[in-house]
């Protein structure tokens, strides 16, 4: 039995981009890449590097969105890292922490995450509050649900 098998009649749909909710960068006129990623996953890190390369090559012709998909069964720090990225987003620094998390993928302990927040000049007390809060958990759940619905 395959755990991830889906019935043949299940309709798959990618949730449309929501500029008010999704983390999006790049030109509105550019090609769109939506990544569902996990900060602790080596394959997500490979995708991160590939997207960096494509962004450099296409310049203003790429639009990129990142959605969380922490694989908590195999990556014990993935959910905490996603929550940290969302807490950084509250302070307007999502993309900065996003990049830092992938560059330092082997260092995702709580003390590391707090250190990254301080390094970026975030209000660490607010960062801690936000990453433990309901809205951050709901945001991550929304992304995971969207990823599951997308197949």
Walk through the language-model features, giving the residues of each:
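Extracytoplasmic thiol/disulfide redox context detector
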Residues: 1-73, 136-151
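Structural alpha/beta surface segment adjacent to cysteine/selenocysteine redox centers
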Residues: 32-119, 123, 128
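Metal-dependent phosphoesterase signature
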Residues: 125-137
């Amino acid at each position: 039995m395959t755990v991830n098998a889906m019935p043949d009649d299940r309709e798959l749909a990618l949730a449309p981009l929501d500029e008010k909710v999704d983390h999006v960068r790049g030109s509105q006129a550019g090609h769109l890449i939506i990544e569902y990623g996990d900060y602790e996953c080596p394959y997500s890190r490979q995708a991160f590097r590939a997207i960096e390369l494509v962004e450099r090559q296409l310049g203003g012709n790429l639009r990129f969105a990142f959605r969380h998909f922490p694989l908590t069964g195999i990556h014990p720090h993935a959910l905490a890292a996603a929550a940290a990225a969302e807490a950084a987003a509250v302070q307007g620094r999502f993309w900065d922490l996003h990049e830092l998390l992938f560059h330092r993928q082997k260092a995702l302990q709580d003390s590391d995450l707090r250190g990254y927040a301080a390094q970026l000049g975030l209000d660490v007390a607010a960062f801690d509050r936000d990453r433990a809060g309901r809205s951050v958990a709901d945001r991550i759940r929304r992304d995971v649900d969207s990823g599951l619905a997308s197949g």
